[in-house]
């Protein structure tokens, strides 16, 4: 991640094609050790690629990763729509029409540990 961030900073700073030395200078300026091999690998992998395309590809990959809870579609209007639905529900002892209560499950902390990828590779 640090090599990618340094590469992007070098590009934002006006360097058209950042080199390993640019990455090393940026990282050392903030007190971060730079491994020359990893910097070279990062520069080689990013050479000739459009940064915006890389960001969009990353967003697509992140959207495919499950983060636990499944998103629930909420109609526009949110709570007022729920109140309207409750008002339109049949009154009386008709328990068959009543929606089942949702049980909240406590998620273990381990579910956050593995998101399907390592951000530090």
From Swiss-Prot:
Single GO BP term: cytoplasmic translational elongation
Keyword Ribosomal protein attributed: yes
Superkingdom of origin: Eukaryota
Disulfide bonds: none
Modifications the protein undergoes after translation, according to the UniProt entry: Phosphorylated.
Family listed: Belongs to the eukaryotic ribosomal protein P1/P2 family.
Quaternary structure and interacting proteins, as annotated: P1 and P2 exist as dimers at the large ribosomal subunit.
Protein name, per record: Large ribosomal subunit protein P2
Species name: Taenia solium
